[in-house]
Structure formats: C-alpha cells, structure tokens
Amino acid sequence: MGLNYNQEDFMGLDRFFQDAVSHNNTDANAASSIEVEMYECDCMYPTFAEIARRSGQPEIGAMFDAIAKEEGMHAQLLTKLYSELEVKDSAETLEAKRLVSTIESQIDAVASDSRGLRRALETALEVETIESQKTYPAFAKLAAEQGNMEVATAFEAIVKSETKHANWVKRALENLLEVA
C-alpha cells in the first residue's frame, strides 16, 4: 500500500479517533481510555517522533516523545483506579496499529516528504483536540453524574494535559509551516 498524501486523513489515523466509542458507563470509558492512551504511548507518538527526527526536526521528535510519555502516565493513572479492569485492544485499535505499522514500513518515504511530518502534526493536533475538547470532558461529566468523583477528577486532569499537548502541537505545526 503506497502512501496517499491527498487522503483526507493520515493513513486512516484521523478516522480512528473521530470514531472513538463513548459509553454510558464510566468503567467502559476508562477501559477505552486506557487502550487509546497506551496506543498513543507505544505506537502513534513514537512513530511520529521518528518521522520528525528523520525529517531533520529533533525538537519536534522530542515533543512527540514527551507527549508519548504523558499518554502512558494517563493510562497508568486510570489503571490504578481500575486495577481489576480487563483492557483488550478493540477492532479500531488493532486497525490503527496496522496503519501505524504501514507508516513505519515506509518511514523513510514519509520522512523525506515534507508533507509526512506536516500530516503527523495535523493528525496529532486533531487527536489532542478531540480528546481535550470532546472525549475527556464528556467522560469527566459522566463520571461525576454517576457519583465517581475520583475518576471524574482523573479525567479532568487528563483534559488539562491533552489541552497542553494540543497547544504544543499547534505551535510546532505553525513553526513548521512558517519555515516551509
């Protein structure tokens, strides 16, 4: 499969996050969150960091590494609150992992094309914006409505972190576009 930079999304990753499932159950939302945060920590952001480094942008690579680390911390926070929760990769996460593997297999081509890093940044911005403005605020609200204030507080903390990530990525994208 060749990369098609004219696609609306970056190898389908945008679609994965737009289609993220929200449940009417705080436990299910926590499981979904752990799954997605681990995917971002272990797969998506390390790949984006490598694209940045190979594109000659080590600062952006370091930013993606920092975001990956914090996404892992989000998963750990929720895992502590839900130590008994069984988390399995959904079909959507398995598909996203397959898409990242495709990107990794073509990483030299992606990194050598200026659109590759731009699309990685655009995807990251979209992901972090969805999480900070839609997904986690809704999860926090539902947890509070269901009387689970500890989990609501955790989701609210994640909102702040995801907002910070969105701001970092937005600045990096703006800076990249200025020099392009």
Swiss-Prot record:
Binds 2 Fe(3+) ions per subunit. In the diferric oxidized state, His-74 does not coordinate iron but, in the reduced state, the iron 1 ion shifts by 2 Angstroms resulting in binding to His-74 and loss of the interactions with Glu-40 and Glu-131. One of its GO terms (molecular function) is oxidoreductase activity. PANTHER family: RUBRERYTHRIN (PTHR33746:SF4). Its cofactor is Fe(3+). Residues 21-180 form the Ferritin-like diiron domain. It comes from Cyanophora paradoxa. This is Symerythrin. One of its GO terms (cellular component) is cyanelle.
